[in-house]
């Protein structure tokens, strides 16, 4: 049996008011990203890239930099290299190749300029992207309790105590790259 109309109206009105307040509240906007207060926005880069092509950028800022990229249309992937100004999916140190938002944290010890490659995935004829470049001003804690500040050059070439962990992450990254390449190849063959 249906509820009498007179009793349902107050609940409907309350529900509509609640939904309207959620939609109109300033924190509910999907376009706004939450970032730590220590991060400083340096640049916002927007661009378009054709399927299977690269767009290259150069980063000269010192310190720890965070790149956050979202695809406005299509699917753009992010490749970063300290050794090449034209990184690709075959030649890179850092990558983010997801179907959603991409993010890469560039360590302070990377040699500048850093090459950034934005790749337009072949599954879309054209991809549009927006990349936000942040300076990460957070102070890292040293394993022995002292604060570790960004390297000033004398320390930049030395390996940190977590080198075995870095090696396992690198191996995992290579495996993911191979898996993604195989999946892309299968998708290209099927479609």
Curated annotation (Swiss-Prot):
Keyword Transmembrane helix: no
Keyword NAD: no
Glycan attachment positions: 53
GO CC terms of this entry: azurophil granule lumen; extracellular region
Protein location: Secreted
Cystine crosslinks: none
Entry's Gene Ontology BP terms: apoptotic process
Tissue: Mainly expressed in hepatocytes and some weak expression in germinal center cells of lymph nodes.
Similarity comment: Belongs to the UPF0669 family.
Protein name: UPF0669 protein C6orf120
Name of the gene this protein is made from: C6orf120
